[in-house]
A protein has these predicted regions:
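Intrinsic, short, N-terminal disordered tails of RNA polymerase sigma-factor systems
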Residues: 1-225
């Protein structure tokens, strides 16, 4: 999906990406002091503004990473416009995003203190991306009738990559040891490919992709550490 595309394709791309990554935007607005309701309204209004002004089309390949673009754009939106708009004008009542405020507020209570707003945003962005990738992996394995394989081996994609006792897993899944190792290898390969595909949808070049991948890996490693 090319971020530089115009017209309906660009609009659909923006809708999909913002739908997937609304929580980092919501969390950022909350940390700027907005109430839960105001934060939700602000993100909805911000999204409508992006659609109205075709901002995805302007955030072309030379602009680099969509993550950085959205963070800067939302920060400016909150500072320059949001606080000056009346509640009656906030998106005109339209709510194009599906925002689960209850879930978001619960998640915010689990966040670690001591980091900056931008660090929190990047971490939440990284987690949203990983959750999106896991969803794709789960659907892929379900389509192949391999749900049990995914559920039993998905630990190989997390933390230190361990996934349990190989012999025990082989017996449980009715695979050989080599079959388990092959399944783990393929799952890791597909995981990396999906991560790169998701990132590619938010950047303008292969160089940006490599930078973004490296950055998000550091973000996750720092949080886990």
């Amino acid at each position: 999906m090319a971020r530089g595309d115009n017209g309906e394709a660009a609009r659909q791309a923006l809708e999909e990406l913002c739908g997937a990554y609304w929580y980092p935007l919501y969390g950022f607005a909350r940390r700027r002091g907005l109430s839960p309701d105001d934060a939700e309204d602000a993100v909805q209004a911000f999204f409508l503004k992006l659609l109205k002004q075709d901002s995805l089309g302007r955030a072309d390949r030379e602009r680099g990473r969509l993550r950085s673009f959205l963070l800067g754009a939302l920060s400016n939106f909150l500072a320059q416009r949001w606080r000056n708009e009346s509640a009656a004008k906030r998106g005109g009542g339209a709510k194009p995003l599906r925002i689960d405020q209850t879930w978001a507020e619960e998640r915010l209570t689990q966040e670690v203190d001591g980091s900056t707003e931008s660090e929190d945003f990047d971490r939440e962005w990284a987690y949203a991306l990983i959750e999106r990738v896991f969803g794709r992996l789960e659907r892929f394995h379900e389509a192949k009738g391999r749900e049990r394989v995914f559920e039993r081996l998905k630990g190989c994609l997390l933390g230190d990559g361990s996934y349990g006792d190989e012999a025990e897993i082989a017996a449980e899944l009715e695979l050989s040891g080599a079959g388990v190792r092959s399944a783990v290898f393929q799952m890791r390969q597909r995981f990396r490919r999906y991560v790169e595909e998701e990132i590619r949808d938010t950047v303008g070049s292969e160089a940006d992709l490599r930078e973004e991948l490296s950055h998000l890996c550091r973000v996750l490693a720092e949080h886990q550490g």
